[in-house]
Structures are given as structure tokens and as C-alpha cells.
């Protein structure tokens, strides 16, 4: 289908209310797949669909059909974002984004993976696509009634879906977003700046002080059980040969969240640095993989329970979609990211599962020397080798097509190609060519019934995701899934490597190396993107080096405090942890030691922080109280006192943000780069080690802390007066903007939901309870199952009907059996197949 010049009307996300009890349609059947005669979709009071059919194709047809009813514009733009086809409908403002997406990712290899799928896998993707297309055909015939308002406002029609399209929304949302982060060029830029500032030896020491690989004191999901080996950090000899590499082209968004260009070229770099300095790295989707999870076996009133909070971010429509699938090989209920065909947080009454971002290192960048006589060749294994090259044609609304070259070296896709400088940069990805396998592994996980079978199944997962399981008897399982490379000796994974073949990857590590555990002796599994196991090294990601300063301690302490408690008491942890200060536990001992001989004002300030409940709850006027106000000011001063003189003004943007919710936050809130580095440095001193670089310039830590506290007190007194009890800090609202993780519109610009203050919790929260006989479920998915407005501008059904529930830490039940589904249903729709 093509563009619509003057489309009007609005798609009613819950059309079944209008069509009565049995509205029949007659979609076209695809060849080679048996079809049942009908599919039935029930919806409850929140609009959550439950699909009943006889085959895998049928339930996935119903899945796609329901998604199209609820989220058609969001899914259209997700598909275009994943494939780099945004400019085709939104114009040249998105051309730079499309160029990036079309040249940095290997789209042909995804298509080949889909073409090579077994028929059982293809039935699932094709069923989903056919269901989407059936609803789109209806929309095309009844635009005034059914077309979602954003299509009319942006002036184009929804496009047809294929099995390939369904695969790409997974690849774009999981592999491209959660398994492709890389900071190696950022790290190299910082290292070189520090070597220029301090000399080669001290600069290298400072780099290792900020970006280490292993911290013995960092909390782990699998408990420590012995000594930890350390990789010696030796400055790679090839760094002396490495020329200046082109900076990474990261997405830049405006204050509303809309795509505003790339960080390479124009004013994009300055805008990116300003945002990071103000809001911190966790405000940017390329640095903020997040989510939390805790599971406890043998609670007092159940066999076990889990609570998952995937922190995808907050957007309208929601990043999360709830559904039940019943038929063929599937009998499962739950929810998933962006209506992906794999249910990420679900149960089948035998087994429940969930996930968090693993944040392990699956990518490396290699710098390549170009042939000065032919820049389409690079030096590898002693000879000039030609890139694999293919054209990518980008359609641009209202303008001529643009053709760009996609290149691939032996290591991976080429992200930068600079003939004038004689170099290129290629990125190796452990999951490249296997992302569709990752999708199907997750899909078929829903058919497993034991921890052991699930663990075997998860060997097929290729992206770095923490996977959790719980059976109906409350037994717990954990696998740090993904494929991880064998790196050559001398390859520092924090920095770009030589691409001449000397340090290419040497295959993949065996699945036995992946951290995993069943039935841990602790009786619980807890994760907030912390280190999976003691021997597992940190990735190169600048914003997330594993340290003792880790927010997961909040969950660990609270789970330990309610050991043997009820399900309700374990669930209540979610509310407390959503507001708890992430730095307090590390800073209070320093403050109390620093004010032993301090003035009464300083002692009063420390007492204020010591008596504080550590909660960042906003008051009725939209402000935080005296203690959080002081804490934010103190952290700001402390980070400045410790790091500014060492790194300089031009690099301090990397350390400046306190990460507190007085600034708009992204998917989550955690300890800052500066705080992790400072705590790690102090831990080494406490352990009797002499750090290679002195962050405090010979001063006692007490003196630096006291000076920072005095600076905070002086600043607040000048701004708000000397009476501490009246100090206030304005809260940034918690917003659900209408843009996806690339800044692409997924709703109209006025579709913004908000709450007065930030909650450090999942984009959804789900609770699964093991009863011994089955699994009970409840969840909450704000704003709602829908997310678009009517032509009049009024919200449609299920636009935001879970937002209040979410704000109050409430949950809605998720029925499983057909009897319970029918009992809770407020509508039923039957789709006839032929």
C-alpha cells in the first residue's frame, strides 16, 4: 500500500466493542499451512487479548491481528525504524538515521535467516504477518472509522507485513538495541585525552582507574565461591600505530525525545555532550540497558514467586504489550516488548520466565587500513582484501531516492569508511547471522515445562540477556544467555583492535562458560543488571562498569530483610526500591567520618542525611524535600572535586551528571560513572592497595568530602537561605513521550503521559506466583493496551487506563485457563479462516 494524502479518521483500538459478540472475517490463506476454521479473541476490561485457535499459525494470526487493532501506527514505525525506512514516510529529517541503520546493520543476512527457517518457525512469523495484514485490509476499506489518527496526520497508509518484517522488529528491538552497545572509540578518545594531559604512563593509569574489567567487591547474581582471577591490564602496543578514528555516530534527540540528528557532524556532538552532562548516560538509549528481577523460593504463603521490572523506557504507546496465546503448541500468557512474537515475561502454568539486560561484551571494533590505490580494499592477513559491498536504496518522501553503500569486512559491518584518512572501522557482533535463531529460541521457550529443558533451550539464545525461570514448585533457574567471542591474546576488549587479522576472534566460547545456576543455595535470584558471576568481566560500555557501587544492593538487602515473608511483602519491595537513593549507602560512612570535628552546620547536614529514609518521593507541589536536595548538591560537588582537575573541562561532561531525578531520566536510575569509579578507588585503598593514579592528589578523603559538603551547603544557602528544612528541589516529571528508542514518532506529538515524579522501576511490572499446582499471574502495563487518540483528539479505549494503577503500585490479574479468560472477558471476536 502507498501513501495517503488526505487520510482522516481514527482507528478504534477496541473495535470488538462495536462489532458485537461474533464478528467474522475471511482472510486469505497462505499455501502450505493447515488452517482451522476460526480464531477467537477475548478481551478483558483492560483490553488485553487472549487468542484461542487450533494451530500455531492460528494463534499467531490472532496475535498479529490483535496487535494491529491496538498498536498499528506504533508497529508500522517500529518496522521502519528496524529496517531504516523512516524517511520514506517522514521525509529528509530522518535521512541520516536511515543511512546509519541501512549501512551499520546487515539486513540481507536477516532475510536469508528467515528464508532458511523450518516450516514450523515460518508458520509463526507468517501467521503474525497475515494477522496484521488482515486488519490492515479492513482499515483500508474503512479508513474514516478504523485508520489510526497518526497515519492521517503524517499522511501515509500502513504497509503490508511479511514474515521478514516480523523478524526485523525483533532484531531491531533486541539485537540492535540491547546487544550492540559499544564504547570502544569513546574509551580510546578518553584514553588519548588523558595521555596528552598526564603523559602515557599516568594517562593509562587514570584510564584503568575509571574503566576496569573486574571488581572483586561488585555484587553478583551467582554468589562468589572462591578466589577471582584478574586479567592484567597492559597498554596494547598497537595503540601507538592507531590513528585518530572517526567518532561514533550516536543518535541525538531533542528535549521532547524526537530524533534530531547524529553525534558525528554539525552541532550533533555538542548537543550529545550537553545532554550527557545534564542528564547522564542512562538518559540515552544507547547507554541504558536496564531491568530488575527478584525471585524467592518458599515464601510463607506460596511455593515461590518472582517479580520482573523490564526497564525498556517509557513511551506512548507503551513499550510493552500483553497477550495470551492458546492453541497448537502454545498455552501461555504474559507480556512482551513492543508486541514481539516472543513473549519475554510469561508463564505456561508449568514454567514462568523473565529477563533483564545482560550488559556483557558481544561486540568489538576493528580499525582497518585502506588500500591507498583502492579504498574498497583493506589490509588483512598480509594482503589487500575487498569489502563485501552492496547498494541500499533509501526512499525519501517528496525527494529523489538516495543510494548508499553498505560494506562488510571479515570482522563485520563497516561503521566508518574514510578514504582521505586511509582507514575504516568494522564491528564484529557475536549474534550477527544468528539473531533470528535468538528470536525463535525465545518463542519456543514457551513450550518448555522444566528448568532443565529451559536451560537446554537457552543455549540457542545469541543475545546477551539474563534469562530467569521458575517452575510451579518454586524452583528457580538463571542463565546469562548469549554467544560470546574467544578473543586473541593481547586484545583489550575495552578498546578498538587492529583489523589486520592478527587479533580477529577465534570462534565462540562454549555454552558451559555462560554463568548459570539452578536452585541456588541462597533460595533467591536477584539482578539489576549487575555482574552475573564473579569471574565475568565488565564490558567496554562506558556507562556501566561493574563496581561495588551498584543499585542491586537495594534489592539484595530488602529481599534478605523479608526472608520467609509473604508474597505481598516481597512484592512490596518494588515500591520501596523505586524511590530509594542509589548513593546513600556508599556516601554516609564518608560523610560521618569527615564531620567528626566539623562545625555544627556540617554536623546538622550529615544528621539530616543520616535520619532520611533515603526516599525520593515527590511532594504534592512537585518538589523533593531537604534531604534529597542536599544529597544531589553534595554529589554534584563531590564529583567535581574529585574528577574535574584530573580529566579537564573538555572531558568532564562524562562525569558531570549526578543522575538524580531533578533532571529527566531515561529507562532507569543508577549510580553514575563518577560514583562507581570513586567507590572502586576507595575500596582499593581500604584493601591496602595503592591505586596507580591518585584521584585525590594526596589529600585525605575526609578533607575532600568535607570540602564538597561545605560547597553544597554554601550553594544551597545562597540560593534558598540558611534554614535547611525549607530547601527544595524541583522534580522532573516522569513522562511517556510519543517517540521510540531511536527518536522516531510512534504516535502524535501531543500523546504524552506523565506522573509528577520518577519511579525507578519497570516499564511494566509482572508478578508470578508458584502454587505447587500451577502459576498465578498479575501485571501492570502503563499507559494501557492502546495508545492512540481519536480524530477528535479524545483518548480512545485503553489509552491510559493502567497509568493510575501503575502509579499506585497496583496490578491487574492475568487469567490463564479458558474458563477464567471467559469469566473476565468483556468482549469476544471470532475471525473465520478458510
For the regions a protein language model found, what residue spans apply to each?
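Glycine- and hydrophobic-rich flexible loops that cap the catalytic core of alpha/beta enzyme folds
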Residues: 327-337, 342, 346-351, 355-501
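Substrate-recognition/specificity elements adjacent to catalytic centers across diverse enzyme folds
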Residues: 30-305, 310-316
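C-terminal motif of bacterial Sec signal peptides marking the signal peptidase cleavage site
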Residues: 18-21
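Second-shell loop/turn segments in exported
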Residues: 60-62, 109-123, 426-428, 439-445, ...
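Bacterial N-terminal signal peptides that target proteins for export
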Residues: 2-11
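Bacterial signal peptide processing site
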Residues: 23-25
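Hydrophobic alpha-helical segments
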Residues: 423, 463-562, 615, 630-633, ...
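Terminal end segments
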Residues: 541-602, 694-834
Amino acid at each position: 500500500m502507498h501513501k495517503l494524502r488526505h487520510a482522516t479518521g481514527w482507528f478504534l483500538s477496541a473495535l470488538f466493542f462495536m462489532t458485537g459478540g461474533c464478528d467474522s472475517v475471511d482472510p486469505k490463506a497462505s499455501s502450505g499451512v493447515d488452517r482451522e476454521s476460526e480464531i477467537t479473541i477475548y478481551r478483558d476490561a483492560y483490553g488485553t487479548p487472549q487468542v484461542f485457535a487450533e494451530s500455531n499459525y492460528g494463534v499467531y494470526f490472532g496475535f498479529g491481528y490483535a496487535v494491529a487493532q491496538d498498536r498499528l501506527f506504533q508497529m508500522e514505525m517500529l518496522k521502519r525504524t528496524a529496517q531504516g525506512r523512516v524517511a520514506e514516510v517522514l521525509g529528509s529529517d530522518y535521512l541520516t538515521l536511515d543511512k546509519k541503520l541501512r549501512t551499520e546493520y546487515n539486513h540481507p543476512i536477516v532475510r536469508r535467516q528467515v528464508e532458511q527457517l523450518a516450516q514450523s518457525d515460518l508458520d509463526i512469523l507468517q501467521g503474525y504477518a497475515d494477522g496484521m495484514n488482515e486488519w490492515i485490509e479492513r482499515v483500508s476499506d474503512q479508513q474514516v472509522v478504523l485508520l489510526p489518527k497518526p497515519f492521517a496526520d503524517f499522511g501515509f497508509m500502513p504497509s503490508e507485513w511479511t514474515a521478514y518484517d516480523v523478524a526485523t522488529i525483533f532484531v531491531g528491538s533486541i539485537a540492535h538495541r540491547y546487544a550492540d552497545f559499544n564504547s570502544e572509540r569513546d574509551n580510546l578518545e578518553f584514553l588519548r585525552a588523558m595521555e596528552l594531559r598526564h603523559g602515557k604512563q599516568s594517562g593509562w593509569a587514570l584510564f584503568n582507574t575509571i574503566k576496569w574489567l573486574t571488581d572483586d567487591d561488585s555484587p553478583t547474581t551467582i554468589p562468589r565461591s572462591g578466589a577471582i582471577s584478574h586479567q592484567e591490564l597492559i597498554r596494547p602496543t598497537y595503540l601507538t600505530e592507531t590513528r585518530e578514528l572517526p567518532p561514533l555516530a550516536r543518535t541525538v534527540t531533542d528535549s521532547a525525545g524526537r530524533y534530531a540528528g547524529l553525534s558525528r557532524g554539525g552541532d550533533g556532538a555538542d548537543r550529545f555532550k550537553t545532554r550527557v552532562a545534564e542528564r547522564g548516560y542512562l538518559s540515552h538509549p544507547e547507554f541504558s540497558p536496564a531491568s530488575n528481577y527478584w525471585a524467592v523460593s518458599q515464601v510463607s504463603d506460596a511455593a515461590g514467586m518472582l517479580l520482573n521490572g523490564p526497564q525498556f523506557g517509557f513511551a506512548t504507546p507503551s513499550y510493552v504489550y500483553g497477550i495470551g496465546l492458546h492453541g497448537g503448541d502454545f498455552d501461555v500468557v504474559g507480556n512482551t516488548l513492543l508486541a514481539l512474537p516472543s513473549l519475554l515475561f510469561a508463564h505456561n502454568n508449568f514454567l514462568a520466565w523473565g529477563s533483564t539486560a545482560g550488559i556483557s561484551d558481544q561486540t568489538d571494533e576493528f580499525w582497518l587500513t585502506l588500500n591507498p590505490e583502492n579504498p574498497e580494499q583493506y589490509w588483512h592477513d598480509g594482503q589487500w582484501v575487498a569489502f563485501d559491498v552492496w547498494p541500499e536504496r533509501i526512499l525519501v518522501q517528496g525527494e529523489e531516492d538516495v543510494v548508499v553503500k553498505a560494506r562488510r569486512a571479515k570482522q563485520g559491518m563497516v561503521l566508518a569508511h574514510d578514504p582521505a584518512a586511509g582507514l575504516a572501522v568494522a564491528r564484529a557482533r557475536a549474534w550477527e547471522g544468528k539473531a533470528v535463531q535468538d528470536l525463535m529460541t525465545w518463542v519456543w521457550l514457551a513450550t518448555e515445562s522444566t528448568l532443565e529443558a529451559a536451560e537446554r533451550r537457552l543455549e540457542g539464545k545469541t543475545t546477551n540477556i539474563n534469562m530467569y525461570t521458575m517452575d510451579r514448585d518454586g524452583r528457580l533457574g538463571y542463565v546469562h544467555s548469549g554467544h560470546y567471542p574467544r578473543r586473541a591474546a593481547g586484545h583489550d576488549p575495552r578498546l578498538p583492535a587492529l583489523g589486520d587479522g592478527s587479533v580477529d576472534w577465534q570462534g565462540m566460547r562454549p555454552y558451559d562458560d555462560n554463568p548459570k545456576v539452578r536452585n541456588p543455595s541462597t533460595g533467591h535470584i536477584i539482578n539489576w543488571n549487575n555482574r552475573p558471576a564473579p569471574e565475568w568481566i565488565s564490558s567496554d560500555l562506558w556507562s556501566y562498569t561493574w563496581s561495588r557501587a551498584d543499585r542491586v544492593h537495594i534489592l539484595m538487602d530488602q529481599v534478605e530483610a523479608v526472608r520467609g515473608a509473604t508474597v505481598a511483602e516481597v512484592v512490596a519491595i518494588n515500591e520501596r526500591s523505586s524511590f530509594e537513593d542509589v548513593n546513600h549507602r556508599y556516601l554516609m560512612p564518608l560523610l560521618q567520618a569527615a564531620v567528626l570535628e566539623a562545625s555544627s552546620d556540617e554536623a546538622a547536614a550529615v544528621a539530616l542525611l543520616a535520619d532520611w529514609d533515603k526516599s525520593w518521593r515527590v511532594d504534592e507541589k512537585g518538589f523533593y524535600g531537604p534531604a534529597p536536595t542536599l544529597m544531589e548538591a553534595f554529589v554534584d560537588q563531590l564529583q567535581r572535586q574529585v574528577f574535574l582537575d584530573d580529566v579537564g573541562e573538555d572531558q568532564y561532561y562524562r562525569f558531570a551528571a549526578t543522575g538524580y531525578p531533578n533532571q529527566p531520566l531515561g529507562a532507569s536510575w543508577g549510580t553514575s560513572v563518577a560514583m562507581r569509579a570513586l567507590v572502586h578507588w576507595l575500596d582499593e585503598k581500604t584493601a591496602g592497595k595503592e591505586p596507580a593514579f591518585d584521584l585525590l592528589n594526596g589529600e585525605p578523603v575526609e578533607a575532600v568530602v568535607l570540602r564538597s559538603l561545605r560547597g553544597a551547603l554554601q550553594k544551597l544557602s545562597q540560593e534558598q537561605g540558611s534554614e535547611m528544612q525549607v530547601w527544595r528541589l524541583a522534580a522532573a516529571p516522569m513522562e511517556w513521550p510519543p517517540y521510540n528508542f531511536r527518536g522516531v514518532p510512534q504516535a502524535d506529538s501531543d500523546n504524552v503521559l506523565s506522573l509528577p515524579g520518577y519511579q525507578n522501576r519497570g516499564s511494566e511490572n509482572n508478578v508470578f506466583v508458584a502454587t505447587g499446582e500451577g502459576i498465578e499471574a498479575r501485571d501492570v502495563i502503563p499507559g494501557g493496551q492502546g495508545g492512540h487518540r481519536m480524530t477528535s483528539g479524545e483518548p480512545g479505549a485503553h489509552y491510559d487506563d493502567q497509568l493510575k494503577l501503575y502509579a499506585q503500585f497496583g496490578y491487574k490479574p492475568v487469567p490463564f485457563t479458558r474458563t477464567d479468560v471467559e469469566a473476565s472477558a468483556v468482549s469476544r471476536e471470532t475471525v473465520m479462516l478458510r
